[in-house]
Curated annotation (Swiss-Prot):
GO cellular component, one term: early endosome membrane
Protein name as it appears in the record: Sorting nexin-3
Main location: cytoplasm
Keyword annotations from UniProtKB, A to Z: Cytoplasm, Golgi apparatus, Lipid-binding, Membrane, Protein transport, Transport
Source organism of the structure: Aspergillus oryzae (strain ATCC 42149 / RIB 40) (Yellow koji mold)
SMART domains membership: PX
Keyword Protein transport (UniProt): yes
Record bears the keyword Protein transport: yes
Entry's family note: Belongs to the sorting nexin family.
UniProt-annotated location(s): Cytoplasm; Golgi apparatus membrane; Prevacuolar compartment membrane
Amino acid sequence: MQAVPESRQQTFEEIYGPPENFLEIEVRNPQTHGTSRNMYTSYEIVCRTNIPAFKLKHSVVRRRYSDFEYFRDILERESTRVTIPPLPGKVFTNRFSDDVIEHRREGLQRFLQIVAGHPLLQTGSKVLASFIQDPNWDRNAW
């Protein structure tokens, strides 16, 4: 005869307390800067976490698409065992339209959520936390 494990009610803290490890990444608030040929869009990256690999529990930084491209290239070079997902594609027409900017914002958020949520990258990447949390991140420092 097999023993039936005792069941118990979860405590209030178990139900409503913070999860053991959590990571929330949001890409929001796109802003277009410059004029004419020098225009570009930047995006706010908001991170909330209690994962030790990230120095700050809450951070907000701003990055442009080209920063994401450099970041992805650096990740690929430093993390040969992990397949880094693609970024949303380059856009050459109407790239400052609301629809295009929103589509890109969604793609950048999906990219960061996948990358930041990967356990090997959380523990092994030197650039990950810096890109997501350091307002003075410099693509040329890597």
